[in-house]
Amino acid sequence: MPNLQQTASQSQSQHHLHPHHLRPHQQQHHQQQQQQQQQQHTHHQQQQQHHSDFPLPDGWDIAKDFDGKTYYIDHINKKTTWLDPRDCYTKPQTFEDCVGDELPMGWEESYDPNIGPYYINHLAQSTQLEDPRQEWKTVQEQMLSDYLSAAQDQLENKREMFDVKQQRLLWAQEEYNHLKLAASRSSLCSSSSSMSRHDPELLRADLMLARERVHQLKQELTHITNDISYTERGMNTLYSVGEKINARENGCYDIAEVQAIREEMLKVHKSLVSGEKVREELMRSLVQIKNELGRQQISEENSDLASPFDRVCVASQTDLCGSSGDNLNGGARFAEMAKTKLQYAEWRKHIKKLQQQLADHVERIEPGQLESDKDRILLIQEKEKLLNDLNSISLKSRSEEEKRVIHQTRHKLEEDLKEAYEANNTCVANRLRFHEEKQLLLDKLQEALKSTKLLEERLKSFSSESTFSISSGSSLGSLSTASSKSALSFTDIYIDPFAVDSPIDVVDLRRRSQRLFQQHQQQRLHPVHPVLQQQQSAEVTLSPRSSLSMETPPASPMKYNAGADQTPQALKEEPTYANALPAPPAYTAPPPVPISGVRARPYDLDSTVLDCMMLEAKLQKLNMGTPLNLAAAPLSPISEKPSLLDLPQEMLSRSSSTSNTRSVSAAVSNESVAGDSGVFEASRAHLPRKELAQVQIGLKYLKQEGVLVVSLERANNLLALWTASADNSQVYLRAALLPNSLTSIRTKALGDFQKPVFNDTFAVPITLDKLLTKSLQVTVVTMTGQKEEIIGTVQISMAEFNPEDSTLKWYNVLSSKFIPSFESLDIPSTSAAAAAAAVAASNAPNSGNNREESSDESTITSSQTSTLTRNQAPCMELQEQIAAELLELGPLNEPECSDDDDDDEEEELDDKQLVSDVGLMNSSGMLDAYLQNMKQEFADKETNTDRAYLPEKSRGQSQLMDDRPVKRSQTFTPSAAVSKNRYNCRLNRSDSDSAMHCGVAPHTFQRGAAERRSLRFHTKAPKSVTKLHHTHIPRTSLDLELDLQAQHSKLYFLNDQIAKLQNLKEVLQKACENKDPLVAAWAIENEEFQRLVARADPAKCPEERQLQKLLMKTAKEIHKLRKTKVPKGCPDLVSFKEKITFFTRKGLSVPELPSEFTLPEANPIEEEEEEEDEDEFYNSAETAIAINTALVASSNRNKNLSEHPHRATSGAVPKLPAPVATPAATPAATPVATPVATPVATPAATPVVSPAVQTDAKPAAAPIPVASSDAEQQRFDYVVDRNYGVEV
């Protein structure tokens, strides 16, 4: 046997005998080759052990290839093969005989570092990507066929909507021509007052409205045409993919083709990246041109006024996050850091919870179903509007044929609407409810990300070395089974903000669906006369002149009863001001208590007031259970908003506002009527001022004397705060500058609670720099005999005070009933303050000054921070506790060292720890976090050996032990008098070996490396991340082909967008140079253009851009999280449905400048010649004939559709109709020229064309059908039109 092997090896070397079917070999890295060879060696070693019981047949031998692969030699037939001849005895013959993960004879599973696992069929000498044991490919083909059938129905709905809107355009055109004719007749008869039936001004207004209606309908036709072409192109792509896969043998790609497709996808991705840069540059230039056009228009209207684009907002020029951490001293800084960390952790948990809820919610939503429901509902509304137009037509001037056609069309529309109402049942409402819940979760997620971003910036401000991130670094969503870094994942291809258009307003869509269903129920219970039905429908639906577009269907919020669907939960989750520090979301705002003595009336709650209420509720949560210092929170003297806690209960219960400041009033008034414009804006509800308690305060600063003049003038409606229980009750005002004010000023006491007039002026000596760190607190105090009671307070931040001007303003008073333990906020009188100062001076004569200065410095720093964060002043209760602790613990904390420098440092440390201890006294968890941070702070003072070092034990246990602190200099002295049980000194020097994180480092140590700081706290990836690979079904050939076509589609539309943007840029530049007012007005007023440039507006704040990036990252994380929930071995149906729906979703639309901004305006005043009037007659007649022809054609088409409905064949991909050229199939100019920039042309990729889509450059302006020759020669008689009083 050995001689036979040697002979075989010599024969092979001489004749170059190689296996007939070699595996594809790629040039890989040395490490990847070793792993692959090791896996193959292990597999064949196990196989050899399994075959060791059976000897090789006669004439067979074993050999190894150059890469270590074992093959077998048949010396009898002089052939080589990879198949072991003993497999016929050990392996099953067919797939039906396989058990578990077995493969039949002739099949082998292999692995490629770039592609991942694939399968080799040695019998057919082929390779494939799919696992032959799974039926996933068949399921995918069936899902593709079902979706194409549903997409065909959706396309038919779009085409039917196009036909209905085109009929509306014809009727609008006829109305415009009729009005134009009436205006010309009125101008001709203007000399005779008896012949003039109508006012020329009214005719001119009606003519303008009709022209706007025609223009609006043409724009809507353009949108529908684009939607149809986009859907057709997507369906053509899916058809071509299905036919290409079916044309392959076994419907699978081999490994060489898979590798080629992968390389092509990477090349297309590079082209996409470069093209996106070009698109962003074009959009930025469009923003500049739009701003320039706006400046020109404003300068033409009023050259004296300055342009708003040149104004800079100076409302807040302070970086709140960056300066808050620097202004705090040691103790307060760590207290704020610990509090912020807890809040940050709570928000992170809330974000993870929302992501999990969104991942669970996606499984209940069918991809692409929302678009179909939207088209179905909009089609119903279009038919309603067409029916209204037909009902408004006067039949007296019509011929019998026209009357018959109009009656038939009305009957057909009524039948269609009846069927549509029945189809729009509870299932559609439930689906829309799921989408509305998803939108609500997305809104919550956006608010959570915004709050987390603010907390993240605040944490970064505390320490420059700290870096926080809310994005996960794991790559769980990669669909490459080999996890190659260069592979494109599902999120890279199908989650693109520019690949889809603006999202659908699900709330508005659901309201429309509910309205249609309710209207159908009312019609079933109470049949209505057609005319009355028309009037009721007109009240709900918009008029033909509405600003309805396919992207953002408008609807008046008053029409759908916006407050009916609101819940108290929506009120609790109201977003607050952006500059307020967010609170953990688990907080539930307590219901406000109505004030006794105030008459509760059902006022409409203003949205600004609602924002204030939610701001106060979240500020309560910030203090972590401590009494809220709302008394120290000044109210803005500019807005003068009332306190939300003083609002009646009925007013709060009737609130239905949302986060939008342009809220909708719940009362129906003349101002809430939207009319025919489709634009709605409700007036704000004005709260009565007499229900609020107010105080008038004047402020003026004298720089030369250094004195603040405070004038307490008068008050108003103090009975809202307190009801006098006796006749001898009096009221006075008391004021003080906080913090640490030992004196206070007060006015005289008056018995008038309704409108007391004090007129007291006081001078407070204070320097200007200290004044800006203070807050003026004014309290309202009542006296009944010898008893005094504080009933309200006002606080004014002096940081906003302008010392150059004198102010006299009204301030709202916050009631003391809503502040727990309000007595502790009482300001000490002059005598009490003097006594407290005397006690402090007698108890601590030596160190009292230093302590008072340190405490004052800390509180002033806290006051500065509160001023920067807009009216979050420190609590007086906290200051009093700090002062009390200083007086009591002062002698005990005196250092026992003779060194004066060390004494000062130790006193400063004691003060810092004391301040922070008092601030964290409210929560045990916060106290533990603070003590931990304090230990790290004192332990990590780098290498300063002269600094006093506090012991490890807490201060509460220090009385039982030696209280002397351990100095770093004494730790190196053998004679230091320090007990052994207390000796614990850590020297963590910065950028040294001892600063490394305790534990096993995942990386090798490199001295002087730049990335050492990040290596210190490097965390290992969780084990669950590494186990996620190879748990799902790998990609099939259909998946691969869909990914490739998706990349090509994105590149095609990107090139189309670039071409349109370039054309738009050139037109706007010429208009800017020529100062064209029409183009400037279009650029400023067009909503679609405004949405487009808003994406790349450089004036957009960086926080919003970062928030959009975080939303994109979160969307990818949600997809990854959802994929991890798919059981092992089960197909991901939702992801595949999202893939195929990607092709029919409308992308980002670039607006096109209309060729004619307005129709030619008729001049009803000037006289025209008779020949032009006759031309108008004939044009009107031709339009009427065209309308009749279109109605008959639409009726025949609907009849054919009802008789021959579309049914797609199941189990196979539907065939394409005859190819017809469309504008969608014509490639646009491609600025990004690459070899793979154009999609792969296939014979099956023929577009599906709609009969309604014209090949004209402007399909929206569909040409009116030409009348027959008989109709042109028909003679028309003049008939008096009773609507307009003219002959037609």
Swiss-Prot record:
Residues 201-229, 335-463, 1049-1076 form a coiled coil. GO terms for molecular function: kinase binding; molecular adaptor activity. GO terms for cellular component: apicomedial cortex; cell-cell junction; cytoplasmic side of apical plasma membrane; Kibra-Ex-Mer complex. Residues 541-550 have a biased composition (Polar residues). InterPro entries: C2_dom, C2_domain_sf, C2_WWC, WW_dom, WW_dom_sf, WWC/KIBRA_Hippo_Reg. Residues 54-87, 101-134 form the WW domain. Residues 15-28 have a biased composition (Basic residues). Residues 1-60, 541-560, 841-870, 890-913, 942-972, 1253-1272 are annotated as: Disordered. Residues 942-966 have a biased composition (Basic and acidic residues). SUPFAM superfamilies: C2 domain (Calcium/lipid-binding domain, CaLB), WW domain. Gene3D superfamilies: 2.20.70.10, C2 domain. It comes from the Eukaryota. Residues 896-910 have a biased composition (Acidic residues). Its main location: cytoplasm. GO terms for biological process: border follicle cell migration; negative regulation of glial cell proliferation; negative regulation of organ growth; positive regulation of apoptotic process; positive regulation of hippo signaling; R8 cell development; R8 cell fate specification; regulation of DNA-templated transcription. Signal peptide: none annotated. Residues 691-811 form the C2 domain. Residues 1-14, 29-49, 857-869 have a biased composition (Low complexity). Regulator of the Hippo/SWH (Sav/Wts/Hpo) signaling pathway, a signaling pathway that plays a pivotal role in organ size control and tumor suppression by restricting proliferation and promoting apoptosis. The core of this pathway is composed of a kinase cascade wherein Hippo (Hpo), in complex with its regulatory protein Salvador (Sav), phosphorylates and activates Warts (Wts) in complex with its regulatory protein Mats, which in turn phosphorylates and inactivates the Yorkie (Yki) oncoprotein. Kibra acts synergistically along with Ex and Mer to regulate the Hippo signaling pathway. Forms a complex with Mer and Ex. Interacts (via domain WW 1) with Ex (via RXPPXY motif). Interacts with Mer, Sav, Hpo and Wts. This is Protein kibra. It comes from Drosophila yakuba (Fruit fly).
